Amino acid sequence: MVKIVTDSTADIPPDLTADITVVPCFIQFGTTSFLDGMDITREQFYARLATGEGLPKTASPSAGMFEQVYGRIAGARDEVISLHVASALSGVCTAARVGAQAVDAERITIFDSESTTMGLGWLCLAAARCARAGLSRAQIIALLDRMKTRVHVLAAPDTLEFLRRSGRVGWASAMMGQLLHIKPVIGLYRGLVRSIDRVRTRSHSIRRLIELATELGTLESLAVLHTTAREAAAELAHQVAHLAPQPIPVVEVTPVIGTHVGPNGLGLAAVVASGE
């Protein structure tokens, strides 16, 4: 049987993770380290972030953690597909590969999703469905290779400040954004984060998210993402409900991503229909 593993940046709703093993990333406030989703909840994290005590640091799971997980879940005849946050954004894939080599690299495939949050999550859910259906590891990997070219993550942070503090944008850009009340709109596709637009109001940034999702064409899956913006996320889900055929999950993103986005952010994770 093929077992599916991912990391906590995948943001898969808890009721959908039964067939997926999630390895937690680390979050560090000062000298105190937490396992994402285990030692600290999203609510606790965002409450601490709002206090201004300092930007937390994030870190990948260790290779030893992956070694333990692979050794535990992979029986004598089992194989593993381990899907992770884009390698261009994090060292998780590297740690997973080292862990796999310590167990049995021939039976474990490390898959670079080139995405994160529910962009990665949609890939994991597809892999789990295929595994339940009895597809081979090679068949599932082939499907994932095709699918990841159709995955898009769009985000509208409320401010450039947290991107500046995490080193994602320069000080001058962030200060100019604050002075002019600029709201950035960014996209993640095939591991590349790019600035798509900068608008002047929150309502314009939300409208831009909807426009960008609509421009993608027919969607097979769509999730609404947020950081401490439940009401706005619920309204956004209502506004984009016509774009996808299935119920649209509303997900508060992992602290590992929220560290860089900051509070009151909104986003979308979309999978374009394959046409097959």
Question: Predicted segment positions?
Answer:
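Class I S-adenosyl-L-methionine
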Residues: T32-A105
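Short catalytic-loop micro-motif centered on adjacent basic/acidic residues
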Residues: K57, S82, I110, A223-V224
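Mixed-charge interfacial surface used for oligomerization/domain docking
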Residues: K3, T9-T32, V92-T109, S115-E276
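Short beta-strand->loop
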Residues: H84-A86, F111-E114
